[in-house]
Regions:
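Core AdoMet radical
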Residues: 1, 8-24, 34-55, 63-86, ...
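Short, flexible, glycine/charge-rich loop motifs used to bind or transfer phosphoryl groups or to couple energy/partner
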Residues: 3-4, 62-63, 161-163
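Generic structural signal for well-ordered alpha-helices
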Residues: 3-4, 28-32, 57-60, 86-91, ...
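Radical SAM enzyme [4Fe-4S]-AdoMet core and its adjacent flexible, acidic
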Residues: 67, 71-181
Length: 182
């Protein structure tokens, strides 16, 4: 197909859907197909982990998926799940041999919940904190320090630099309707 000829020089695909994609079997079938490609070093997706891990990993495996290439970016939403449930989903993925990292938006009112999440996540699962775009104010010094204790890389979120397209030659972006652009 067309994707195989487009993707050869790139080495990795990350699916960042609008909404939760991994509840749909066809995403797992597609990730499995991509993971079988010799030119692919990694395939992954962003998810809120609201799917049945055992069932979906079975679909991935039945479609020839190579789990050593699978990556999961798990996004924690405290209004949608609990710290113990989210951490257990991460633990299941890690136990299955899947690389996973967690991310959450740096909402100041959620600081205590995010501290608990950091403490509860299994070893091998880092927690990234993203700057809250809708905060409409600067983080206080205390908030910055609190988020930095959770995620030492949070400082990069505070001083966002413009993308440098010349650093990303030949990258593809797939629109929601399936169109690909460079």
């Amino acid at each position: 197909g067309h994707l195989e000829t487009q993707v050869e020089p790139y080495g990795a695909v990350m699916v960042v859907p609008y909404g939760e994609a991994l509840i749909h079997d066809y995403y797992w079938e597609g990730l499995a197909r991509l993971s079988r490609m010799g030119t692919m070093e990694a395939v992954g997706a962003q998810t809120n982990l609201s799917f049945d891990i055992e069932r979906q990993l079975t679909i991935f495996k039945e479609n020839g998926g190579r789990k050593e290439k699978l990556r999961v970016w798990a996004t924690f939403h405290p209004e949608m799940t609990t710290v113990p449930l989210f951490a257990e989903q991460c633990r299941k993925l890690l136990s299955a041999g899947i690389r996973v990292c967690a991310g959450a938006v740096g909402v100041p009112e959620n600081l205590e919940t995010l501290r608990r999440l950091k403490e509860t996540l299994p070893g091998g699962c880092c927690l990234w904190i993203n700057r809250m775009d809708g905060l409409n104010r600067r983080y206080t010094e205390e908030e910055q320090q609190a988020f930095l204790r959770i995620d030492p890389w949070f400082y990069r979120e505070l001083h966002v630099k413009k993308a440098m397209p010349e650093q990303c030659p030949g990258r593809l972006f797939v629109e929601s309707d399936g169109r690909m652009r460079r």
